[in-house]
Amino acid sequence: MITTTPFGTAPSGSPVTVYNLVCAGARARVMDYGATILGIEVPDASNDVVDIVLGFDALDGYFDNPACYGGTIGPSANRTDKGQIKIDGTVYQMACNDGPDKANNLHTDLEYGLHKRVWNATVDEITNTVSFTCKLADGEL
């Protein structure tokens, strides 16, 4: 079963929604801001239900979230040496935003990356799933 809950407003002014998924004694909470995992609750060895995801209780915690807790990172995740990637022989330069001398790129764009955007959500009640999509213009990030 999937239910939705309003969660606030993104800095862009778009409403943010939490999707609550329940199946076989487990519960997952995800939101469309950053296609972010908010929580996964499962029974522990004592059969107590515990949340195994680090994150914040309020939406605004995700606005300034340098650890990117739960968010979808991309198009490039982790560190990229000198902020450069090579695709089909063409070198693309990304902003250098990481390291003591800011010589590398971390997670494409920490300020405007995929984890900072409101994604489109599609709920499928038959398969009990939520799918998130985010379209970018060619070369946007």
Regions found by a protein language model. Give the residues of each.
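Surface-exposed acidic/polar loop and edge beta-strand patches at domain peripheries
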Residues: 1-141
